[in-house]
Amino acid sequence: MISKEQKQKIITEFGKNPNDTGSVEVQIALITDRIRYLTEHLRSNKKDHSSKRGLLKLVGQRRNLLRYYQKKNLEAYRTLIAKLGLRK
């Protein structure tokens, strides 16, 4: 799981202020971090089907948020994708 310190670091990096947890950028960054954690977990635990299902749900949630953000603000979307290192 993501530690509190790591979560706070992501919030301060992507948020507008240190308490900004609801903005789209922060949500996408936090979900991306959880996806990376679960991907590593599933590499060593191949038969953990409940975690795999959770990973697929997170990927879908992130995809929906990215689609919304792309429609809302294309330039900021592109910078966010580059910052997170996502392929788009």
From Swiss-Prot:
Keyword rRNA-binding applies: yes
Membrane-crossing segments per the record: none
Domain of life: Bacteria
Entry-linked InterPro entries: Ribosomal_uS15 (IPR000589), Ribosomal_uS15_bac-type (IPR005290), uS15_NS1_RNA-bd_sf (IPR009068)
A GO MF label: structural constituent of ribosome
Pfam families: Ribosomal_S15
UniProt KW Nucleotidyltransferase keyword: no
One term under GO cellular component: cytosolic small ribosomal subunit
Record's keyword terms, sorted: Ribonucleoprotein, Ribosomal protein, RNA-binding, rRNA-binding
GO biological process, one term: translation
Homology family: Belongs to the universal ribosomal protein uS15 family.
HAMAP family documented for this protein: Ribosomal_uS15_B
PANTHER family (alphabetical): RIBOSOMAL PROTEIN S15, BACTERIAL AND ORGANELLAR, SMALL RIBOSOMAL SUBUNIT PROTEIN US15M
Functional note: One of the primary rRNA binding proteins, it binds directly to 16S rRNA where it helps nucleate assembly of the platform of the 30S subunit by binding and bridging several RNA helices of the 16S rRNA. Forms an intersubunit bridge (bridge B4) with the 23S rRNA of the 50S subunit in the ribosome.
Subunit structure and binding partners: Part of the 30S ribosomal subunit. Forms a bridge to the 50S subunit in the 70S ribosome, contacting the 23S rRNA.
Record protein name field: Small ribosomal subunit protein uS15
Organism listed in the record: Borrelia turicatae (strain 91E135)
Underlying gene: rpsO
